[in-house]
């Protein structure tokens, strides 16, 4: 019983790492800095309701932020998102 639960946890963690790690790697600059504009949208851990903006790789898109956690691809206005992430 305990072994099956442990193996399920290891499998779940492995899948989570396979999904998350490549996204984080693709967001890195060659010097190791993370390009926040390449991070996926992340609504965070709380259940509050804040309309925010993130860059989806092409345009700035509105999303709901929960108020805590998430990542830095989060802007209070479309203008701030465009200024930081849109390439001329």
Curated annotation (Swiss-Prot):
InterPro entries: Kunitz_BPTI, Kunitz_BPTI_sf, Serpin_venom_toxin
Site annotation Reactive bond for chymotrypsin: residues: 47-48
CDD domains: Kunitz_huwentoxin (cd22598)
SUPFAM superfamilies: BPTI-like
Molecular-function annotations in GO: potassium channel regulator activity; serine-type endopeptidase inhibitor activity; toxin activity
Localization annotation: Secreted
Keywords: Disulfide bond, Protease inhibitor, Secreted, Serine protease inhibitor, Signal
Keyword RNA-binding: no
Cleavable signal peptide: 1-27
Residues annotated as site: May bind Kv1: 39
BP-aspect Gene Ontology terms: envenomation resulting in negative regulation of voltage-gated potassium channel activity in another organism
UniProt domain BPTI/Kunitz inhibitor: residue ranges: 37-85
Domain of life assignment: Eukaryota
Intrachain S-S bonds: 37-85, 60-81
GO CC entries: extracellular region
Reported tissue expression: Expressed by the venom gland.
Propeptide stretch(es), residue numbers: 28-33
Similarity comment text for this entry: Belongs to the venom Kunitz-type family. 03 (sub-Kunitz) subfamily.
Described function: Serine protease inhibitor that inhibits trypsin at a molar ratio of 1:1.
Name of the protein this chain belongs to: U15-Kunitz-type theraphotoxin-Hhn1b
Species of provenance: Cyriopagopus hainanus
